């Protein structure tokens, strides 16, 4: 086995790809490998809080990553600096992942126990993908086969794939379910050729009931692996076995992917997942806090949700970073503390250019007004007042002229825009509820 420091550095590089940036920066980056004795890898964490968190949240992922790198089933122990001198004491290590047992052809325990349909937060950006995944889980190979889910990093594709696997196994314990990444498929295929075990490899993946394969875009350019996966796909599909595939883009946009594979990916259902809206981001944070037994003020939830809008991993990682920071400096969690905790991971980006459309959408989200109603002739208070707020913000946050603003609101006269701006400006001086609503809208627009 390679030098222990080199091994751990290699593991950290892989772990950095698998967790959010905040999680990596907070929990993993500062760890070091202490020693390796009798198949037990001892990792040094910076403090007790980090050690306990790593043990409860990352030991399984670390075991899996090390197994992928070395092929060895290593147990994991976490220590803190002052306990290094005592590392020879026979303390019970974290048990290696049972999925690493070579006798288990079907690594069902590779499924993350936290990734179920019950823990998935449904929002406008993932509702259809969730419904399709549930339909596939309830009736494998009868609903959509294959199911192709695509979207950006950390949006929930892997969560849905694991949820499908859990559901199938729960309702049919004898089902053969395999989850793996396309990278692992490629590595195992290459190893099978090198070791003259191609038949074993094919039997392993062509005799399953459900194949869940993640990040299929990494097959691009790998001609031999694509050839092998093509035949694996055909074998499973012909036997009415379910195939679920994920990617960061739709099949037609994956470069150097063979047309015959592309067409097969399009046989079933293709569904996408988009970044969560503010409401969904807050719901995700609340669910994460509840799952971890954390009491987080609403103002902190809103702050984090406004600052982190890229993906769910970053969002949850930011929440945990805030909690860790609060614990380490022994201060209560509030918005100011959250800002301090996240200052290093929230990039100082250029000021966002806000359009009138952005404003209409944000105001519409807060006041439950359809976009078309901003341009309509409706004068009911439920529409007219939000329209005036949107006009006010368009005047405040964009460089658009009065006539241009009026045009974007159904061709209204510039005097209407002036009146709306004056009215809302006056109300904001005394109306605390309106102040909060406008603040919420501004948060969405950041």
UniProtKB/Swiss-Prot annotation:
NCBIfam families reported in the protein's UniProt record: DnaA (TIGR00362), PRK14086.1 (NF010686)
Sections of the chain in a coiled coil: none
Quaternary assembly: Oligomerizes as a right-handed, spiral filament on DNA at oriC.
Record region (Domain I, interacts with DnaA modulators): 1-81
A GO CC term assigned to this protein in UniProt: plasma membrane
Organism: Bacillus cereus (strain ATCC 14579 / DSM 31 / CCUG 7414 / JCM 2152 / NBRC 15305 / NCIMB 9373 / NCTC 2599 / NRRL B-3711)
Family, similarity comment: Belongs to the DnaA family.
Alphabetical list of CDD domains matching this protein: AAA (cd00009), Bac_DnaA_C (cd06571)
Region annotation (Domain IV, binds dsDNA) ranges: 327-446
Highest classification ranks of the organism: Bacteria, Bacillati, Bacillota, Bacilli, Bacillales
GO molecular function, one term: DNA replication origin binding
Location of the region described as Domain III, AAA+ region in the Swiss-Prot/TrEMBL record: 110-326
A Pfam short name: Bac_DnaA
Main location: cytoplasm
Region (Domain II) residue spans: 81-109
Record's keyword annotation contains Lipoprotein: no
A GO biological-process term: DNA replication initiation
Function text: Plays an essential role in the initiation and regulation of chromosomal replication. ATP-DnaA binds to the origin of replication (oriC) to initiate formation of the DNA replication initiation complex once per cell cycle. Binds the DnaA box (a 9 base pair repeat at the origin) and separates the double-stranded (ds)DNA. Forms a right-handed helical filament on oriC DNA; dsDNA binds to the exterior of the filament while single-stranded (ss)DNA is stabiized in the filament's interior.
Binding, ATP: 154, 156-158
Subcellular location: Cytoplasm
Annotated keywords: ATP-binding, Cytoplasm, DNA replication, DNA-binding, Lipid-binding, Nucleotide-binding
The protein's name in its UniProt record: Chromosomal replication initiator protein DnaA
Domain comment in the entry: Domain I is involved in oligomerization and binding regulators, domain II is flexibile and of varying length in different bacteria, domain III forms the AAA+ region, while domain IV binds dsDNA.
Keyword DNA-binding appears in the UniProt entry: yes
């Amino acid at each position: 086995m390679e030098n222990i420091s080199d091994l751990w550095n290699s593991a950290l590089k892989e772990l950095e790809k698998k967790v959010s940036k905040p999680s990596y920066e907070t929990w993993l980056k500062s760890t070091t490998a202490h020693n390796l004795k009798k198949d037990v890898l001892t990792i040094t964490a910076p403090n007790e809080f980090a050690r306990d968190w790593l043990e409860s949240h990352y030991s399984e992922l670390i075991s899996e990553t090390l197994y992928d790198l070395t092929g060895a089933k290593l147990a994991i122990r976490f220590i803190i600096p002052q306990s290094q001198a005592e590392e020879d004491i026979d303390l019970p290590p974290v048990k290696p992942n049972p999925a690493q047992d070579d006798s288990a052809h079907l690594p069902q325990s590779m499924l993350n126990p936290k990734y179920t349909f019950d823990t998935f937060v449904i929002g406008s950006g993932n509702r259809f993908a969730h419904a399709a995944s549930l339909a596939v889980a309830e009736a494998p190979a009868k609903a959509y086969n294959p199911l192709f889910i695509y979207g950006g990093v950390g949006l929930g594709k892997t969560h849905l794939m694991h949820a499908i696997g859990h559901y199938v196994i729960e309702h049919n314990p004898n089902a053969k379910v395999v989850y793996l990444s396309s990278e692992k498929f490629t590595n195992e295929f290459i190893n099978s050729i090198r070791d003259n075990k191609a038949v074993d490899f094919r039997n392993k993946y062509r005799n399953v009931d459900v194949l869940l394969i993640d990040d299929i875009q990494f097959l691009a350019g790998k001609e031999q692996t694509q050839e092998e996966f093509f035949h694996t796909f055909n074998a499973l599909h012909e036997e009415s076995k379910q195939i679920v595939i994920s990617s960061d883009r739709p099949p037609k946009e994956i470069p150097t992917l063979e047309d015959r594979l592309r067409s097969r990916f399009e046989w079933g259902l293709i569904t996408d997942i988009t970044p969560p809206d503010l409401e969904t981001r807050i719901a995700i944070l609340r669910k994460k806090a509840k799952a971890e037994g954390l009491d987080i003020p609403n103002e902190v939830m809103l702050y984090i949700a406004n600052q982190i809008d890229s993906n769910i991993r970053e969002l949850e990682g930011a929440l945990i970073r805030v909690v860790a920071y609060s614990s380490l400096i022994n201060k209560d969690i509030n918005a100011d503390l959250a800002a301090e905790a996240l200052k290093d991971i929230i990039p100082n980006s250029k000021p966002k250019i806000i359009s009138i459309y952005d404003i209409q959408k944000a105001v519409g989200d807060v006041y439950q007004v359809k976009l078309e109603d901003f341009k309509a002739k409706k004068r009911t208070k439920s529409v007219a007042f939000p329209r005036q707020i949107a006009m006010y913000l368009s005047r405040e946050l964009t460089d658009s002229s009065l006539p241009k603003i009026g045009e974007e609101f159904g061709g209204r006269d510039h005097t209407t825009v002036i009146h709306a701006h004056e009215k809302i400006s006056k109300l904001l001086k005394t109306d605390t509820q309106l102040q909060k609503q406008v603040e919420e809208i501004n948060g969405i627009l950041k």
